[in-house]
């Protein structure tokens, strides 16, 4: 095995034509993401590194392939994703996305960290190391997301410190608890300070923040935001020195709204991310390739869109060895025939072809899952009394209204059906009962609320994918189906369950922390299709992504009204409120 010094020497010699290269991709239309031009060249690779772009056919290699004039772009980079939201392990996630041209992702494992703490982070790192894709980790900053709910773990600065110098760790993940930052809460500032001292990147989470609050985030050293929903917000972030990662996921779709913010003078401060995207959409669409194609369809030049998806994101996360097709950079590149679709014909990682025509060319590997992460659901036996939502004064209530395909909700104050002092769900008014039950430590705390907008005509839906604390979450038209759904969630140790008229219509077990499956992606996709089909039976007019929208109604850091296991939470005032208004 050659040493790093020997490899460096070989790379230099190979760049001068004095040593045979490992691989040459000939006759490529190479994307220059610095000058935003195309140039015809042969890409010369040694030891996984591009050592030359040859214009005169003067290099030789052990292996040669002809691009036949096709476009070749740098491997695409996702700047912010929670791999757990794909419901796949990192290794299987990698196998889904590499064929789409994604060769690097920056992940925040705060979903599994909220369930299993530091051990959850370690599992993600271990599994990521077995992936063909480069998976870099941002250390979860907000576990739990707030102090107003019960998660499976609490991560202090001391808990994160052992991970700071891990080769796959790039920084501190999205800082969601903005009052903790702006009020100078010591625990949060210690995490930020540790990251700054290690010269790591600090991600933001600036949902709904005003410009002066962004100033406070910047003063703390927070460098990115992926929560912009308007062009004006994006411009403000960039003007205050941030990188903006444009999000296009399964529920949050902000790309079209944010594109007007990108101009020639500020484009280098933008990148793409998915944040949360389900396995079926990842398999069908990909992720960042889809964003690039959409941006091109909306009028952005192909090279500009490719720049956002490669070098911009690489530089944001100080990955200065990738994102560019030039000597000295990683040999991560993608062969593309049609820029309008961005469909990858072949993908190379570190100079090795790892995917072709949508299929992986390598075998699947995976890390061992710790036993208690496989058994993480501990629910109490639920009864009608457990789900009774009482009113003392009248019928006026604080009601959560979902916004289809968005993470935000509206806060309504309206009259609701009440019979003998107890809320009664109404299909006609689309007012359903919502419950969050603590499932980590046998605390049995239960938050109850009322939600409008899901449109269920019957039945109930339950899950343990309830961002970010991932307690058990259930919505329904009646208590009996809600109780059955929760009981089944306990039996399968997490996942999704859909029930109607006392019958289980569909389920998807997620036995790894109640968040991820250990089955291959294709099988997971089929299970997810079963859930979508069952949802159509509960709501025949359903026209939005129910499951992902549903999974965020318990996240008390995104406005306006959310439900946790400790009760209804007003994100605007950052405090609990009563359901009865």
Swiss-Prot record:
Cofactor(s) recorded in Swiss-Prot or TrEMBL: Mn(2+)
GO terms of molecular function: adenine deaminase activity
Keywords in alphabetical order: Hydrolase, Manganese
Reaction equation(s) it catalyzes: adenine + H2O + H(+) = hypoxanthine + NH4(+)
EC numbers on record: 3.5.4.2
Superkingdom of source: Bacteria
Keyword set includes Kinase: no
Transmembrane residue ranges: none
SUPFAM superfamilies associated with the record: Composite domain of metallo-dependent hydrolases, Metallo-dependent hydrolases
Gene3D superfamilies: Metal-dependent hydrolases, Urease, subunit C, domain 1
Pfam families linked: Adenine_deam_C, Amidohydro_1
UniProt record, GO biological process: adenine catabolic process
Enzyme category, top tier: hydrolase
Classification via HAMAP family: Adenine_deamin (MF_01518)
Family classification: Belongs to the metallo-dependent hydrolases superfamily. Adenine deaminase family.
Protein name per Swiss-Prot or TrEMBL: Adenine deaminase
Organism: Lysinibacillus sphaericus (strain C3-41)
Lineage, highest ranks first: Bacteria, Bacillati, Bacillota, Bacilli, Bacillales
